[in-house]
Amino acid sequence: KINLESYSVGHVWKKNVQCNWKIYWENFSECLHCPNIHPELSDLVPLFKRRLTDIKDHPEWSILKDQNNNPKYQGGLKEGSQTWSYDGSAQGHTIESIQKEMESRGQIYISTWPSMFLGIYGDHIRIVRLIPKGPEEVELIAEWLFEKETINDDNYDKSNVVDFAILVMN
């Protein structure tokens, strides 16, 4: 359970993408392109190296899930990582209420198709809205939410999180 009242918007990013919103969603929903286009993300989330977004996308997932604890076969973040950032570090700030879920999955996604997805990570939440501007253009608006304690910590470098996500979304 997450108490959003304890969060503040730490960064907002907007970009117009020259594609139909349906194409954007399709690209977001699969990971066939991830190893080649997003090598940094595929390193952080080893399952993506296999062009999968969920272990259940593999036809033999029920057999594989019990054979190997490697995140490349089970999902989740690479060993030692806590969040989606350049170095995988949450810099000492984690969302305590979801840590059990984060240990096995690495992230939680909630989509309200066709206009928004929410990513919950080890130390932050990212909301991305898609606003169709025409048949061949969609505006992306991404907002990063951080717990107030995190965003007020002078030692927390939010660019580690924000810049990593922008690299992936760009």
Go through each PLM region and give its residues.
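C-terminal catalytic domain of Rieske-type non-heme iron oxygenases
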Residues: K1-N170
